[in-house]
Amino acid sequence: MKMKTIIRQVVLGAAVLAVAGCASYRWTSGVPKEMRTVCVPTFRNETDITELGNVTARQILREFQREGTFRVARQDDAAVEVQGVLKSQNTEYVGGDRRTGMRYGVHNLTVKAVVSVIDRRNGKVLVNNREYTAMGSFTTGQDVATHRRDASGRVAEDLATKIVDDVLRMKW
């Protein structure tokens, strides 16, 4: 075989593999245009972290705005509604260092939630009670409750990212 023929076959094979790898890629969103408005009511909060339901809903709305596919709308004007319940939270002591003369500890905060996505145009449940877990860590001195509340904002951000990513990847 001639060298030119071999080079052509290699280039052709590489092109076929490249096209096959990109076959499912889209330059535009897979979300239908008529579904690109969203509302997120305050999540029901069954944890003992004050205001976590409000903070989580706000973070989800911010994540939708940051991502840009959906426009945030009032509940009456939205095509999609994301509903959720914050089911539980757990604060776990991870460790600390007493050598500094100051007592402090490192803790992990884990929050579990269930989320549903509703098509408000016809009432169809698109996602029914999908479970999510979000986690964040924090360092404390004497006041664990205050530091846990501060960490809950970061946990809400983590939860928001996971939920919005899943909504964007849904089969519409």
Map each language-model feature to its residues.
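Sec-dependent bacterial lipoprotein signal peptides
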Residues: 1-22
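Short alpha-helical segments used as structural interaction elements across diverse proteins
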Residues: 5, 33, 145-146
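A generic short-segment signal for beta-strand/edge and adjacent turn/coil regions
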Residues: 8-9, 41, 49-55, 78-86, ...
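A structural "domain/chain start" motif
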Residues: 21-62, 66-77, 121, 131, ...
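Surface-exposed short loop/turn segments
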Residues: 26, 67-71, 77, 81-126, ...
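Soluble non-cytosolic domains of exported or imported proteins
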Residues: 46-58, 104, 108, 146-158
